[in-house]
């Protein structure tokens, strides 16, 4: 699938593209060999963008036995969709699948608090801003169906001739500075190498042991989530569901004491996510970190009294926090983490999928610029020499942004699950809306690398001053910990009131 030992036909295809497949055109080759571990959103987008930037994707390995279609709804914000101007087929598919329904916010007693509301990134001024850019993506759906979005990425990867090697588990990561390569040892004893290995394999990636010598400890957020998606006809078989939602296309949040629920119903799909505080759970129902749909509706009934869903279709996922580590790159710079392997997020951030795609775009672009001097002399001993610089630039550009985004998760969690002053909400219903800050959704990850690479290079090489501008304007970034945030919340403080700068 693009290695130098295979036939020349796929190599020619990778280098020139195929206009009949509506694929993007690849840039001049950098001769950087890229091995990707993990075929989720981050890994697949990394494969696509690395190909487009001229890198040689020599492998995509995935531990699951096949594509993992678990999940329900995702939110991909405009900052990650800007890149679709380079991928016309995916852009068309997104346009066909977009969800335009408004969002409704209810109290647990049925009182409509707000709605139909739309994400502020679809406010007229921001839609016009994106529409004015060549190939811009004007209207962005409030949600995407995860299965459809994931299949779209898989189809585009297949169009480029790539194959995902499923059922491949990584035993360990390694790098060899003298040889200028990194690699993975698989559980079957085989070894795979490349100039750079992209760890896109999620929580507890084995890459952590190379980068930090240990796994990051986790802490309970005091919440977990029951989530599922299934054909709408199964839900509509229930009389109460038909009376309340029959024939509607709706996206709703229901807010109660110690719990909030997100609900989506369309003619084809029903989905919900129930996020209770841990004190509402039975003692023997502590969630484990697994995307296996192994929860029965009876368990959900214990929390919510009733759920009309098919058996063994629900995932119970603990919302566990991890302090964000500054380093996402191995000591030699040839193993690099993206997506959840680098920074865990929770649903209330409304940004996990967006960050994963932004990471992939940023990394591919950073490697392109870092490798351009070696690429000018063609393949050979110098190929891949710029990789360590490229991965470190990527890390520098992404860490603070990911940290600020994680903090927004606390804001949204408090808004949806801890609101008590309903008179204030009635006076200003926007107080309960999920926050989509403009500093986040107006970002252009590809353009940002081109803008900041020189400054980042000077900072890494000579210690020159460097400031990221992909975080809230006016914010003075400082490293923070989950323990500190928990103390503030336990004292009754709102995280939103503790933020400096413009987080709107």
From Swiss-Prot:
Q: What are the alphabetically sorted keywords of the record?
A: FAD, Flavoprotein, Monooxygenase, Oxidoreductase
- Do you know which InterPro entries this protein is assigned to? FAD-bd, FAD-dep_Monooxygenase_BioMet, FAD/NAD-bd_sf
Can you tell me which residues form the catalytic site? Answer: 227
* Listed pathway(s): Secondary metabolite biosynthesis
Task: Specify the signal sequence span.
Answer: none
Which residues of this UniProt protein bind FAD?
146, 340, 353
Pfam families, from UniProt?
FAD_binding_3
- Under Enzyme Commission nomenclature, its number is 1.-.-.-
Deletion consequences: Impairs the production of neosartorin and accumulates two isomeric metabolites, moniliphenone and 2,2',6'-trihydroxy-4-methyl-6-methoxya-cyldiphenylmethanone.
Q: Which GO terms describe its molecular function?
A: FAD binding; monooxygenase activity
The cross-references to PANTHER family, in alphabetical order and at most eight, read: FAD-DEPENDENT MONOOXYGENASE MDPD, MONOOXYGENASE
What the protein does? Answer: FAD-dependent monooxygenase; part of the gene cluster that mediates the biosynthesis of the tetrahydroxanthone dimer neosartorin, which exhibits antibacterial activity. The two different monomeric units appear to be synthesized by the same set of enzymes, among which the Baeyer-Villiger monooxygenase nsrF is the key enzyme for the divergence of the biosynthetic routes. The pathway begins with the synthesis of atrochrysone thioester by the polyketide synthase nsrB.
Instruction: Report what the protein is called.
Output: FAD-dependent monooxygenase nsrK
Q: Which organism is it from?
A: Aspergillus novofumigatus (strain IBT 16806)
Q: Which gene encodes it?
A: nsrK
């Amino acid at each position: 699938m693009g290695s130098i030992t295979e036939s020349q036909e796929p190599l020619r295809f990778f280098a020139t593209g195929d206009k009949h497949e509506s694929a993007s055109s690849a840039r001049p080759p950098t001769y950087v060999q890229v091995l990707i571990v993990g075929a989720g959103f981050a890994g697949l987008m990394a494969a696509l963008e690395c190909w487009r930037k001229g890198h040689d994707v020599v492998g995509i390995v995935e531990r699951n036995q096949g594509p993992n279609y678990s999940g329900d709804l995702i939110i991909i914000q405009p900052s990650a969709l800007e890149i679709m101007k380079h991928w016309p087929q995916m852009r068309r598919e997104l346009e066909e699948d977009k969800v335009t329904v408004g969002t409704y916010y209810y109290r647990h007693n049925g009182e409509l608090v707000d709605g139909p509301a739309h994400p502020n990134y679809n406010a007229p001024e921001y839609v016009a801003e994106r529409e004015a850019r060549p190939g811009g993506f004007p209207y962005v759906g409030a949600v995407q169906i995860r299965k459809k979005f994931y299949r779209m990425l898989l189809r585009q990867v297949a169009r480029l001739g790539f194959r995902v090697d499923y059922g491949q588990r990584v035993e360990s990561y390694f790098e060899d500075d003298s040889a200028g390569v990194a690699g993975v040892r698989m559980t079957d004893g085989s070894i795979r190498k490349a100039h750079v290995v992209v760890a896109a394999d999620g929580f507890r990636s084995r890459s952590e042991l190379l980068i930090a010598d240990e796994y990051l400890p986790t802490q309970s957020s005091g919440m977990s989530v029951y989530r599922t998606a299934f054909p709408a006809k199964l839900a509509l078989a229930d009389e109460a569901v038909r009376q309340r939602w029959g024939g509607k296309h709706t996206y709703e949040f229901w807010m109660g004491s110690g719990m909030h629920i997100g609900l989506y119903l369309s003619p084809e799909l029903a989905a919900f996510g129930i996020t209770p505080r841990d004190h509402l759970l039975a003692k023997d129902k502590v969630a484990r970190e697994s995307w296996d749909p192994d929860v029965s509706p009876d368990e959900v009934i214990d929390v919510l009294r009733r759920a009309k869903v098919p058996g063994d279709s629900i995932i119970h996922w603990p919302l566990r926090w991890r302090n964000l580590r500054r380093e996402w790159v191995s000591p030699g710079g040839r193993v690099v983490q993206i997506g959840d392997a680098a920074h865990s997020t929770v649903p209330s951030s409304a940004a996990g999928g967006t960050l994963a795609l932004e990471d992939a775009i940023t990394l591919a672009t950073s490697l392109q610029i870092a490798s351009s001097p070696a690429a000018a002399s063609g393949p050979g001993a110098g190929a891949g020499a710029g990789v360590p610089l490229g991965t470190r630039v990527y890390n520098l550009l992404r860490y603070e942004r990911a940290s600020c985004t994680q903090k927004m998760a606390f804001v949204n969690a408090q808004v949806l699950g801890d609101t008590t002053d309903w008179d204030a909400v009635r006076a200003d219903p926007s107080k309960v809306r999920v926050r989509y800050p403009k500093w986040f959704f107006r970002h252009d990850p590809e353009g940002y690398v081109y803008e900041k690479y020189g400054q980042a290079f000077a900072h890494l090489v000579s210690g020159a001053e460097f400031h990221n501008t992909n975080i809230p304007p006016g914010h003075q970034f400082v490293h923070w910990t989950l323990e500190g945030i928990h103390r503030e919340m336990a004292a009754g403080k709102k995280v939103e009131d503790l933020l400096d700068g413009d987080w709107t």
